[in-house]
């Protein structure tokens, strides 16, 4: 159980390991109603395959109420199209009685009186999926490496459930299921929104940074985009593109160019 404002960090300890996650509105559960993450509602609202740190960062329930917000994501490769793995999916491939994430969910949620399901909707963290040119749903080895993680912030009091995927018959876990670690931080801890990037496949990830001007620009807009490892304003409130364009032509403007990663010095001594 997690309180509103607390943080939920799901960590891939050894790399290339999927983890299924879902959360429930705790207050609604006490009233006998089951409101959990709805991947279809979420994709429709954020306009992406899954939320990422930034503007389109929240997972919603079927009532379009936010349940968690993605604060940090070191890998950026997940899935919201497939269900948590099921007993049937293994039986169809000849593996009868195989442990699976949907049954794990049922077991973990039993004490809350939540209805059991043969196939659970879930946020399939680290699962590397896609749809190819023949409209076939594909799955390959995860991109995640040891220590990669996703950090969420609870938007309500929640009941959370997580299952390290036990799939050992496909590349989903590199054919070798390993441990997932879930850590909870109290609201008093502060985490900035960050996306992890690697310069190449062998590099450690680097998280998006706030520029030296962020404390001022963030008071003028919440519309930030990631640019070369920095959060940069995309637009400012109460103006719009035409007003900003006119200001560039006719007035003096100040721009945060930190993402260019260079200094510009002007004035009489600039060439010395």
Language model segments and positions:
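Acidic, Ser/Thr/Pro
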Residues: 1-196
């Amino acid at each position: 159980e997690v309180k509103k404002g607390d943080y939920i960090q799901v960590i891939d300890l050894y790399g290339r390991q999927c983890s299924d996650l879902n959360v429930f509105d705790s207050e609604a559960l006490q009233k006998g109603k089951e409101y959990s993450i709805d991947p279809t509602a979420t994709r429709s609202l954020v306009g992406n395959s899954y939320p990422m740190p930034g503007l389109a960062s929240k997972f919603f329930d079927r009532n379009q109420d936010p349940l968690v917000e993605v604060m940090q994501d070191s890998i950026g490769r997940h899935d919201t199209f497939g269900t948590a793995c099921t007993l049937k999916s293994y039986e169809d491939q000849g593996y009868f009685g195989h442990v699976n994430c949907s049954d794990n969910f049922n077991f973990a949620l039993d004490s809350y009186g939540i209805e059991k399901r043969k196939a659970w909707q879930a946020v399939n963290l680290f699962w590397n999926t896609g749809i190819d040119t023949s409209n076939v749903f594909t799955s390959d080895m995860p991109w995640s490496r040891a220590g990669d993680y996703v950090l969420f912030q609870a938007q309500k009091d929640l009941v959370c459930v997580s299952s390290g995927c036990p799939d050992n018959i496909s590349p989903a876990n590199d054919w070798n299921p390993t441990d997932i670690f879930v850590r909870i931080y109290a609201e008093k801890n502060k985490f900035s929104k960050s996306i992890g990037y690697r310069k190449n496949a062998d590099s450690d990830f680097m998280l998006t940074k706030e520029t030296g001007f962020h404390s001022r620009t963030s008071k003028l807009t919440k519309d930030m985009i990631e640019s070369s490892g920095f959060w940069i304003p995309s637009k400012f409130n109460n103006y719009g593109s035409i007003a900003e364009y006119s200001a560039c032509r006719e007035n003096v403007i100040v721009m945060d160019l930190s993402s260019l990663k260079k200094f510009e010095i002007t004035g009489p001594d600039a060439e010395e």
